């Protein structure tokens, strides 16, 4: 890339500037950019414009006028690190620490994501359709698109495995996972791996915390998180330090 400090636009699942979105991966990416002090603007995105058909995606504009679109929060982060636009937060981790960081991200992004997704899209589908990410679509098309999305997510959750559990089993797994993450955070003002600054896992964790505390389609998850003091202290601290310009959850 021609410039180490590009002009960056993050395309998210809502228009509102100064507000968290319901997507953990959008908030994760925004946290990652703020951890490296890279400024950006936000706009509402569409799945049809995203290179990989999902949110978030970004437009990177260089000083020479060239621009590119990238999807997937992890791939966007790796590209920006490679270009020198943001710092590599994991550069000084030992191999064991790097493995722990990756394991935490996998717990959040490859397990908790599906547990939370079931609560949102299956247990609280109408909230997701009429208040959440589909709410900007006109009503009649929204009904049709909503049923298509519901069918796709139901099949995905069944194939992945979460959809095969009973509601009680999913609730137990969700509580178990959040409680384990709360234990990882522990007491005191520190980051997940106990260092002086955040790592990639911290961006993932804050993404899941802020989106879960903001969304109205996951009341059980929100109640769990609000009942875990270490996680709430962590979320409050990151919000105050890096997102003071954003409206906080209630």
Where on the chain are the PLM-derived regions?
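GST-like fold's C-terminal all-alpha helical module
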Residues: 114-230
């Amino acid at each position: 890339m021609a410039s180490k400090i590009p002009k960056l636009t993050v395309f998210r699942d809502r228009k509102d500037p100064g507000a968290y979105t319901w997507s953990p991966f959008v908030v994760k990416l925004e946290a990652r950019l703020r951890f490296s002090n890279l400024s950006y603007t936000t706009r509402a995105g569409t799945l049809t414009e995203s290179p990989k058909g999902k949110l978030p995606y970004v437009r990177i504009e260089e000083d020479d006028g060239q621009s590119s679109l990238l999807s997937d929060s992890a791939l966007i982060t790796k590209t920006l690190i490679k270009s020198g636009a943001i710092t590599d937060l994991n550069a000084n981790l030992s191999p064991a620490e790097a493995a722990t960081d990756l394991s935490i991200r996998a717990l959040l992004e490859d397990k908790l994501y599906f547990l939370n997704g079931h609560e949102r899209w299956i247990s609280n589908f109408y909230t997701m359709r009429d208040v959440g990410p589909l709410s900007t679509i006109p009503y009649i098309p929204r009904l049709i698109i909503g049923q298509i999305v519901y069918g796709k997510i139901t099949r995905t959750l069944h194939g992945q495995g979460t959809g095969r559990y009973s509601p009680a089993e999913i609730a137990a797994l969700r509580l178990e996972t959040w409680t384990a993450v709360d234990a990882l955070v522990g007491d005191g003002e520190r980051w997940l791996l106990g260092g002086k600054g955040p790592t990639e896992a911290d961006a993932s964790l804050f993404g899941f915390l802020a989106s879960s505390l903001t969304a109205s389609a996951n009341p059980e998850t929100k109640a769990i998180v609000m009942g875990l003091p270490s996680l709430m202290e962590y979320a409050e601290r990151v919000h105050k330090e890096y997102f003071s310009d954003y409206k906080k959850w209630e």
